[in-house]
Amino acid sequence: MAVVHRFAPDADLDSGTGTPVGDEGYNLYILNEAADWDYGDASSLVFSIWQRPWAHSWLILESPRDRLEFGHTGDLGQAKPRFHEGVYQKIRDGDPNPIAYLWQTMADGQLQIGKPNRPPTFVWRMPITRRRYQLIYEHVMERKYDQFGVRSNNCTDMVIETAALAGINLIHRIRLTWPPETKVLGRMRRVWTDPQYRILEYSSCDVLDMDLRQLARSGIGSDATEWYLALKH
């Protein structure tokens, strides 16, 4: 799902190239671990989610003095089953709308400070001004993190709203149309009975990953993956 305008009206852009500029030493990094799910059909998608249920997007805010790595995490599986586990459990139980589990909002969200336990598949760097740095820092510190969901309030949503504060709009949404039934582990299983669960739209690490790579190829921001992986954390 495309964005209408790539940059905010007040974005800090080079007058000649139209690309983002900033003050020396100030940068915003978007770190993305894509799930690389198979979106070919519903059965393939369900199987790939079962194999690789984890994906994550997070950020680094950098100034000449320090570097803050942070993100929004949740779906920890302590009070309730994790999203993918809850769906599969409802499928096994014969629930008429197992996919409806993804419409829940978990209450275990939290601010992640520091490096997560898995490396990113891609890191994108964008220069920002000192003013943008301060704006983003204050937003991150004041933002609420307790709510965490698939359809809203997920890790990618937090990255997207932070990027918007830096003056750039990123492509990140996906819309999935589920069939009423699909094959799961060799058997046809009910996905939904109530048609309100037919379409699932959410912010996707996979979609964001493709957009960030395209931006780097076109000279908007840059690929900082090797730089990040070489850091001594």
Q: Model-predicted segments: where are they?
A:
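Activation targets extended, charge/polar-rich intrinsically disordered C-terminal tails
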Residues: 2-16, 133-233
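Glycine-rich catalytic cores of cysteine/serine-nucleophile enzymes that process amide/ester linkages
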Residues: 2-117
